[in-house]
């Protein structure tokens, strides 16, 4: 007796999603950020002006909806008087995870900017809360 088993599946691994945080405020102006998800808390960190961007790399959690928030803070003389709690990534309801998604967020003096694709200009989407 000969038994043959055939398995079908995805041949390609799911590329991790990326949330990128940039400090484009001004020379000497520090961006403080606290990023957290429904399963991880990365703690409070600081990013100098034009420093290497901070990147969160992750896979979507199925069946849970992956969600990342970052509280961004900045101010003159590092007073951190301006802030915004930004939902930087949210997976929609789905059975198949998203792969290779980009969410780029940049802090500038006049607001918070966003891009969803590489090589596209950042657009202002939020204004700072005081």
Swiss-Prot record:
<keyword id="KW-0964">Secreted</keyword>
<keyword id="KW-0325">Glycoprotein</keyword>
<keyword id="KW-0713">Self-incompatibility</keyword>
<keyword id="KW-0732">Signal</keyword>
<dbReference type="Pfam" id="PF05938">
    <property type="entry name" value="Self-incomp_S1"/>
</dbReference>
<dbReference type="GO" id="GO:0060320">
    <property type="term" value="P:rejection of self pollen"/>
</dbReference>
<feature type="glycosylation site" description="N-linked (GlcNAc...) asparagine">
    <location>
        <position position="64"/>
    </location>
</feature>
<feature type="glycosylation site" description="N-linked (GlcNAc...) asparagine">
    <location>
        <position position="77"/>
    </location>
</feature>
<dbReference type="GO" id="GO:0005576">
    <property type="term" value="C:extracellular region"/>
</dbReference>
<protein>
    <recommendedName>
        <fullName>S-protein homolog 30</fullName>
    </recommendedName>
</protein>
<dbReference type="InterPro" id="IPR010264">
    <property type="entry name" value="Self-incomp_S1"/>
</dbReference>
<comment type="similarity">
    <text>Belongs to the plant self-incompatibility (S1) protein family.</text>
</comment>
């Amino acid at each position: 007796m000969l038994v043959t088993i055939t398995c079908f599946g995805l041949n390609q691994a799911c590329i991790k999603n990326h949330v990128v945080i940039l400090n484009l405020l001004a020379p000497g102006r520090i961006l403080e950020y606290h990023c957290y998800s429904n399963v991880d808390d990365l703690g409070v960190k600081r990013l100098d002006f034009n420093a290497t961007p901070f990147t969160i790399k992750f896979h979507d959690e199925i069946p849970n909806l992956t969600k990342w928030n970052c509280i961004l803070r900045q101010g003159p003389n590092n007073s951190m008087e301006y802030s915004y709690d930004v939902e930087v990534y949210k997976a929609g309801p789905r059975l198949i995870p998203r792969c290779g998604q980009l969410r780029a967020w940049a802090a500038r003096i006049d607001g918070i900017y966003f891009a969803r694709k590489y090589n596209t200009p950042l657009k202002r989407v939020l204004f700072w809360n005081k």
